[in-house]
């Protein structure tokens, strides 16, 4: 009797373990993510289901649509209602017609690029297909920018060359200035203004490049490591080998805005210490479309601002001049969260990255520039 009970207990445990493993693996699948997205769509569920069924099952456009939907719950957009700007969840508000057009237009542009062999389907989904970058208002932008800028790169066969041409053109014509605007501006408004802060220029440039089939991303540093209280945004390109590419004369990852021109003639020989006008960067992040981390409302309340975004990813290692093996001794309780910080005159030390414990006495602050 006892042996039979023991055997039944063992069988029950094995069955439960197998069920747990199956559930765990299922929760990592695209089908589960699609199911969860439909659940979160609420009253907009029919629109999302219609979009998922729009393209032929198994086709690349069908897979592209699934990619957009499964990661959509992480994204929100601002909507202007009179003089009030409210934030809504894309999964609860976006129309099937909008995302169907977005997928179709992006796919056709990608397939007709002269450099399409440089852009894999995975790369297309991540860096060309998304209908947005951050939380800006949603508008129909892709074909407008395509027709406006396509003539600049009609005969260009290399993605890097197309990136350079568009980058230089927009940098010359879109003026960076400190402006006060009413909330988040959509990219068509930015197009009519042709001016804004560095974030708005990077946002605009990223949209234009994606409309032309260039795998563009918006990278940023939350704060300069040695100047002021602001950060900086710029547009990079992801090459076919997944290396971050920016314009450079010497082969190194160049970040615009890092050199502040001298206002006066400086004789460096008159100074005891090295003098330059370089703005230095500690960490670089990128707005992805993929969900990078789970950030619930409850968890977000206890996190520094930089870590509240579910789709920003640390890409510091993809830039040149990176220091590695930054392990330092520390005397803190093992359960305490640790952050990498930079110092700002007005605010003191502010978090800019996560630090990972090696053990209770050492911490790895991660790659830094």
Task: Please annotate each region the language model reported.
Residues 94-100, 240-252, 305-306, 310-318, ...:
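Short flexible/disordered coil segments
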Residues 1-3:
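N-terminal secretory signal peptides that target proteins for export/translocation
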Residues 5-66, 70, 262-369:
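Mixed-charge, low-complexity segments
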Residues 44, 50-53, 67-70, 77-79, ...:
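Hydrophobic transmembrane signal anchors and adjacent membrane-proximal interface regions, especially
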Residues 27, 68, 79, 99, ...:
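Compositionally biased, intrinsically disordered low-complexity regions enriched in proline and serine
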Residues 32-34, 46-50, 55-193:
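Secondary-structure boundary elements
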Residues 30, 35, 154-157, 162-164, ...:
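Hydrophobic/aromatic-rich core segments of domains that either
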């Amino acid at each position: 009797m006892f042996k039979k009970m023991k055997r039944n207990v063992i069988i029950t445990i094995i069955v439960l373990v197998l069920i747990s493993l199956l559930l765990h693996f299922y929760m990592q699948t695209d089908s589960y993510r699609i199911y969860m997205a439909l659940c979160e769509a609420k009253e907009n569920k029919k629109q999302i289901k219609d979009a998922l069924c729009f393209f032929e099952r198994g086709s690349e456009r069908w897979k592209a649509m699934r990619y957009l939907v499964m990661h959509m719950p992480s994204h929100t957009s601002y909507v202007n209602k009179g003089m009030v700007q409210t934030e809504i969840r894309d999964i609860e508000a976006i129309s099937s017609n909008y995302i169907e057009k977005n997928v179709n237009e992006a796919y056709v542009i990608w397939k007709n690029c002269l450099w399409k062999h440089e852009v894999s389907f995975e790369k297309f989904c991540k860096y060309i297909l998304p209908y947005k970058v951050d939380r800006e208002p949603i508008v129909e932008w892709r074909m407008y920018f395509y027709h406006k800028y396509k003539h600049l790169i009609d005969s260009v066969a290399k993605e890097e060359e197309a990136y350079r041409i568009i980058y230089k053109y927009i940098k010359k014509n879109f003026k960076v200035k400190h402006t006060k605007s009413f909330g988040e501006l959509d990219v068509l408004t930015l197009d009519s203004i042709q001016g804004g802060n560095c974030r708005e220029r990077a946002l605009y440039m990223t949209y234009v490049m994606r409309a032309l089939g260039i795998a563009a991303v918006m990278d940023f540093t939350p704060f300069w490591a040695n100047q002021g209280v602001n950060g900086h945004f710029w547009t990079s390109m992801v090459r076919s080998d997944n290396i971050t590419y920016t314009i450079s004369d010497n082969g190194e990852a160049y970040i615009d805005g890092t050199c502040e021109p001298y206002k006066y003639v400086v004789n460096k020989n008159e100074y005891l210490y090295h003098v330059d006008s370089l703005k230095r960067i500690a960490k670089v992040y990128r707005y992805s479309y993929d969900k990078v981390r789970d950030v619930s409302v409850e968890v977000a309340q206890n996190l520094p601002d930089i870590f509240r975004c579910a789709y920003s990813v640390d890409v510091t290692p993809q830039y040149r001049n990176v220091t590695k093996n930054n392990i330092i001794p520390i005397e803190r309780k093992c359960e305490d969260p640790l952050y990498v910080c930079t110092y700002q005159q007005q605010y003191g030390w502010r978090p800019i990255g996560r630090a990972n414990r090696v053990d209770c006495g050492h911490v790895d602050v991660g790659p830094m520039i």
